[in-house]
Curated annotation (Swiss-Prot):
Enzyme class: hydrolase
InterPro entries in the cross-refs: PP2C, PP2C_BS, PPM-type-like_dom_sf, PPM-type_phosphatase-like_dom
Protein residues bound to Mn(2+) 1: D152, G153
Record SMART domains: PP2Cc
Comp. bias regions, Low complexity: 31-40
Taxonomic lineage from the root: Eukaryota, Metazoa, Chordata, Craniata, Vertebrata
Protein name: Integrin-linked kinase-associated serine/threonine phosphatase 2C
EC number of the protein: 3.1.3.16
Region called Disordered, residue ranges: 1-91
Catalytic activity: O-phospho-L-seryl-[protein] + H2O = L-seryl-[protein] + phosphate; O-phospho-L-threonyl-[protein] + H2O = L-threonyl-[protein] + phosphate
Amino acid sequence: MDLFGDLPEPERPPRPSAGKEAQEGPVLFEDLPPTSSTDSGSGGPLLFDGLPPAGSGNSGSLATSGSQVVKNEGKGAKRKAPEEEKNGGEELVEKKVCKASSVIFGLKGYVAERKGEREEMQDAHVILNDITQECNPPSSLITRVSYFAVFDGHGGIRASKFAAQNLHQNLIRKFPKGDVISVEKTVKRCLLDTFKHTDEEFLKQASSQKPAWKDGSTATCVLAVDNILYIANLGDSRAILCRYNEESQKHAALSLSKEHNPTQYEERMRIQKAGGNVRDGRVLGVLEVSRSIGDGQYKRCGVTSVPDIRRCQLTPNDRFILLACDGLFKVFTPEEAVNFILSCLEDEKIQTREGKPAVDARYEAACNRLANKAVQRGSADNVTVMVVRIGH
């Protein structure tokens, strides 16, 4: 079972053939398409005509100010968001650094939530546009750290809320403070330890209650270390990258995360080996996801909190990252969602409040319109839509 999947850097030479890999040993990191690819994963290629390249139009120069925005919304049953928009409250600052002659792309998150037909809002999210100071990384190796996450709770609000409040705090405590031999390996190990520790903390608290809490939650987290994204995922929430292809002059939706459900072969094998079973596509006929935070009663049946971790090098052609829970993807394909957002970003009729940059108003509107449209299309789940703007 691969724990890590890499997105290759844009100009990395092609990987060896499958036969050669088989001879040389197992592949540790699964590659995703390079810059020029239009492959959108399982959804197939996504091509958008007549759209400007990333960084064109009103995207402008993004910056990362020292302030940070944390949005934690209670969420407990893998559903989505309230009716108010939640937005990153500071300007994005583009950090120019004489580091490998590169520019650190600014990142800024925007989010909207709708409760939908659910009685309770069980989704949660966190936006931390810049936590470099809190992480205190070795300045010779790392210039900027950002964190964005969505959590889709089930069985209650407590697991998703706990993860939103504690996972990034555990990550900050475990983040490398001194010089390291390999930033990539150290960050991946940090993420694995963080997920394990957060799950253990919640299960300890849940089991001490009378009756014991049975809540669980998915988790999709994007950790940006300079221009490298590390995507850690449990369950069926997703992260999608919108990347512009210069050759085709079209945009593509690239999947950054892997969904975990009990019908997948390796997931089912792990569950069965642990003594569990899969009925009607669910663990023991009940739980829809095969990896999660919480769900203590299913952990002995093969459900795990070990995330898949993928690595992606940002490029000048990247426009934004979409993070959303399955309430969105029940009624939108990744391609449709990205296309919808792009159309909103090109809408010059969107009005802005005095003092707010037009680009912020457009991203806020894109989140809110997409969440509203998901509800209109009949998503009965909570809906959380987070879009992370990539500044150039």
